Design a protein with these regions (language model features):
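Histidine/acidic residue-rich metal-binding segments in metalloenzymes
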Residues: 75-242, 247
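Active-site beta->alpha loop and helix N-cap motifs at the rims of alpha/beta catalytic domains
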Residues: 68-72
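Conserved small/polar residues in nucleotide/adenosyl-binding loops
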Residues: 250-256
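Metal-associated gating/positioning segment near the N- to mid-region
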Residues: 2-56
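Structural motif
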Residues: 7, 33, 64, 93, ...
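Histidine-centered divalent metal-coordination motifs
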Residues: 1-5, 120, 173, 251
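A glycine-rich helix N-cap at a beta->alpha junction
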Residues: 54-66
Length: 260
């Protein structure tokens, strides 16, 4: 789960530099997310990425295709069959799939193709301009908060759809106690679901925030009880992977507190 930024954003990162960093760290394979320009939502756009991978990657780099056209999270699903043999799976990472019927269509297709759906879970209508967790720190310091439901509501929906369709489903960077509970229960029912969290969600919470923006991330650092639930999820096997989700920004493009 990496963001190698090419094509479209090579001033932030390239496939060459990202794969070199991976090799230096001991990785032999990287999966790169589709928040690119053009987004890999058809064979032509995917080829723009795989041509660079073939030329510049120093280790095995596996692209993800998008779920929706232009990675919008709304509108139409892509033609999965046209690129399924050249991608690790499908994701709109950076954007949540907002429509239940779209996600059901996508999961139905991917179940037939034997491909995984890897989801960034975020309900746009619940963000309300927030940029840190909607907890005590946000209220005390008069900041706009992001509620936990904006994450877990889509996970709850998707686990149900994965159960209905038989799709293999992976949840990116979970951060809330509710997410852990939903996934734990889904696994107990036999749903084909896996998930990851980041090391920062296991080691910090919104009590660690300061007024210098140094811990700006999405999902945000949640409450102490969320951190504890994530730790318990790692220990009992509910959480399958601790993933760093590396993503490069330039100083000028680093999101400010008012943007997500």
């Amino acid at each position: 789960h990496t963001h190698l930024r090419e094509p479209g954003f090579s001033y932030k990162e390239t496939i060459k530099t990202g794969s070199m960093a991976g090799a230096k760290a001991g990785y032999t394979d990287l999966c790169t997310m589709p928040n690119l320009n053009p987004a890999p939502d058809n064979a032509e756009h995917l080829k723009a990425q795989t041509d660079i991978i073939g030329r510049d990657a120093v280790i095995h780099v596996l692209p993800f295709g998008t779920i929706t056209k232009e990675r919008k999270g709304v509108g139409e699903i892509i033609d999965f069959e046209s690129i399924a043999d050249r991608v690790a799976g499908f994701s709109d990472d950076g954007t949540g799939v907002q429509n239940e019927e779209l996600m059901k269509q996508a999961m139905t297709k991917c179940a037939k193709l034997g491909k995984i759906i890897s989801a960034h879970c975020e309900v746009n209508d619940l963000l309300k301009g927030g940029y840190i967790h909607d907890g005590a720190y946000a209220k005390t310091h008069n900041h706009k908060g992001i509620c936990s439901e904006s994450e877990w509501a889509q996970i709850e929906r998707d686990c149900r759809l994965a159960e209905e369709t038989g799709c293999q489903y992976h949840v990116c960077h979970i951060s809330t106690k509710e997410s852990v509970d939903i996934i734990r229960k889904a696994k107990a029912r036999g749903v084909r679901v896996t998930c990851e969290t980041g090391p920062h969600y296991l080691t910090m919470c919104d009590e660690d925030l300061q007024e210098d923006g140094r811990f700006k991330m999405n999902p945000p650092l949640r409450a102490a009880q969320d951190k504890q639930a994530l730790i318990e999820g790692v220990l009992d096997g509910t959480i399958d992977v601790i993933a760093t989700d590396p993503v490069s920004y330039t100083h000028l493009t680093l999101p400010t507190k008012a943007s997500v």
